[in-house]
């Protein structure tokens, strides 16, 4: 019986090898390696895809979050509220500025930042809120925005896992003050290495981010502020332009597989993420909870199906943030997820027999 990977990038690379090869060879012939026209072209294409006025390509999603915080004036002494249930880079973007991430629990059903707990987290040091469209499912932007507006706070979208998702008919990446994307391999839109982007509507944010990522200068060798080497490589821009052409097709396929799992996995021991009707998820990850996730992962591995966890330790209990004083029980929903989560295989190139096998194994577990 063939092994089913949690994700298999080789199928896409092989299917579109000629297009990728042609793009890479163009960059090599022109030696357009650092920034340049291929990165700029992708910025325009990605802004058009998202529906934002601007997109500024950067070297990875973590840098995108850092730049967003800097552009919004976050610095030492400030606080920014972030979800406890997310990948750690969401918090890094705050910490890199010298500010403090304040971790908020997730809801028990969508597993995303819970607007009902935000008021208690706000202090006179709070500058804003980062919401994460986790696993490809848009968070409750309206609920978060209402609280943010009442307190004069910014809202940043972490869209690293949600390229093409929608909240109330609007694309993620166009909702908040700024939005951050990742193109890490395995993301719904991915580079051949690392990449990221910041999208926004305000020209002042766009120009500031462009300057910061380019060593703090608008004109070469004239540095107006301390900057960073966060540019998107030309090679990655060219690859991403190719990948972007296929993204709608990949998204449709992810949604087909995701909704198939929702309909056909009926084991009462398995709980799935809730998808509110006013959202359109893109199923970057298909995460479930089970009573004993290590046992479930072993069971699937015995049947040659690879599963893993997103994420085994919530942010507020990570060793790196011990100094903030969080304790077990501070974010109970996020902690429950960490102790029970499993990520099932899901990628656009999954074959019918693989999808059926995952469903059958899930339904047979402990039954």
Cite the ranges covered by each PLM segment.
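PLP-dependent aminotransferase-like
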Residues: 70-159, 166
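Hydrophobic/aromatic ligand-binding patch that stacks against planar heteroaromatic rings
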Residues: 92-94, 147, 171, 188, ...
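Phosphate-binding glycine-rich loop
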Residues: 31-79, 93-97, 103-105, 170
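Conserved active-site segment immediately N-terminal to the catalytic lysine
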Residues: 157-192, 220-224
């Amino acid at each position: 019986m063939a092994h089913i990977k949690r994700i298999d990038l080789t199928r896409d690379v092989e299917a579109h090898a000629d297009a990728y090869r042609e793009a890479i060879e163009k960059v090599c012939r022109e030696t357009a390696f650092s920034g340049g026209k291929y990165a700029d072209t992708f910025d325009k294409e990605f802004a058009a895809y998202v529906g934002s006025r601007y997109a500024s390509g950067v070297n990875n999603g973590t840098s995108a979050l850092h730049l967003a915080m800097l552009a919004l004036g976050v610095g030492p002494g400030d606080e920014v509220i972030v979800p406890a249930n997310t990948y750690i880079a969401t918090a890094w973007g705050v910490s890199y500025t010298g500010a403090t991430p304040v971790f908020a629990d997730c809801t028990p059903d969508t597993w995303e930042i819970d607007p009902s707990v935000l008021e208690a987290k706000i202090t006179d040091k709070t500058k804003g809120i980062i919401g994460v469209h986790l696993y490809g499912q848009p968070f409750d932007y309206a609920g978060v925005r209402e609280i943010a507006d009442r307190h004069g706070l910014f809202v940043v979208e972490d869209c690293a896992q949600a390229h093409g998702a929608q909240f109330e008919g609007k694309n993620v990446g166009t909702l908040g003050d700024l939005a951050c994307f990742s193109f890490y391999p395995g993301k719904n839109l991915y580079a051949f290495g690392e990449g990221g982007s910041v999208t926004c509507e305000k020209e002042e944010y766009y120009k500031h981010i462009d300057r910061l990522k380019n060593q703090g200068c608008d004109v070469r060798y004239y540095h107006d502020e301390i900057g960073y080497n966060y540019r998107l490589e030309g090679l990655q821009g060219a690859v991403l332009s190719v990948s972007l052409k296929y993204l709608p097709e990949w998204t449709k396929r992810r949604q087909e597989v995701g909704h198939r799992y929702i309909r056909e996995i009926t084991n009462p021991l398995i709980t799935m993420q809730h998808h509110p009707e006013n959202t359109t998820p893109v199923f970057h990850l298909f995460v479930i909870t089970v009573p004993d996730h290590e046992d479930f992962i072993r069971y699937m591995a015995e049947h040659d199906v690879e599963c893993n966890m997103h994420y085994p330790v919530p942010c507020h209990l990570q060793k790196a943030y011990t100094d903030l004083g969080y304790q077990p029980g501070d974010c109970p929903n996020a902690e429950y997820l960490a102790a029970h989560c499993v990520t099932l295989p899901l990628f656009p190139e999954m074959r019918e027999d693989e999808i059926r096998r995952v469903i059958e194994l899930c339904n047979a577990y402990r039954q």
